[in-house]
Regions:
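Extended, low-hydrophobicity, polar/charged segments
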Residues: 1-181
Length: 181
């Protein structure tokens, strides 16, 4: 694995440092279609704005994973949306229609944490339940190397966009990421 240079962090092969990952992420790592690196961070800097300020990683090299609850006829479907940190997921429009839901919104924090087994602020598409749709913005899929959560607030993963787009349940969805107003 070639060394990764992204911001001021020291990136290490994730497969050699499973202790830095959330349990579901560590379990899913062997199934990835490509490489992943991990870097330890201060837990207080896990949120995107604080992370980019603290470590000099541009927001354009970061992808956010949001958990969405889509409802129709009393049934709730959970899904993940993966968009660049410079955009927001079109949850109420495109995501709602794509999932065939009457209503879609961000899943409550307690639900997102319980259903993913990951820490809030560290939720990542790697290691999500296999039944979940993982909607990926084309800009994420095309990214050379993107920073995503690691399942904990104490580290981040760097993963090629193509690896994220090849995750189980992943579907590249044009128009998912919308410019932030």
């Amino acid at each position: 694995m070639t060394a990764v240079q992204l911001g001021s962090l020291t990136w290490l092969p994730a497969a050699d440092h499973l202790e830095l990952l959330g349990a579901p992420v560590a379990a899913a790592l062997p199934g990835l279609s490509g490489p992943a690196w991990v870097a330890s961070i201060d837990e207080g800097s896990a949120d995107t704005a604080a992370f980019t300020d603290a470590y000099g990683v541009p927001a354009t090299a970061s992808a956010n994973c949001v958990v969405v609850a889509a409802r129709r006829a009393g049934e709730t479907t959970l899904a993940a949306c993966l968009v660049l940190a410079t955009t927001r997921a079109d949850v109420n429009g495109l995501v709602r229609r794509h999932l065939g839901a009457r209503k879609a919104s961000f899943a409550p924090q307690d639900v997102a944490v319980a259903e993913t087994g990951m820490a809030y602020g560290g939720i990542t598409p790697i290691g999500l339940p296999a039944s979940w749709p993982v909607l990926v913005d084309p800009a994420v899929a095309a990214g050379e190397l993107l920073v995503v959560g690691s399942g904990t607030r104490g580290s981040k993963l760097a993963v090629p966009g193509a690896v994220l787009a090849a995750l189980p349940g992943a579907e590249v969805l044009e128009g998912l990421g919308q410019p932030v107003d």
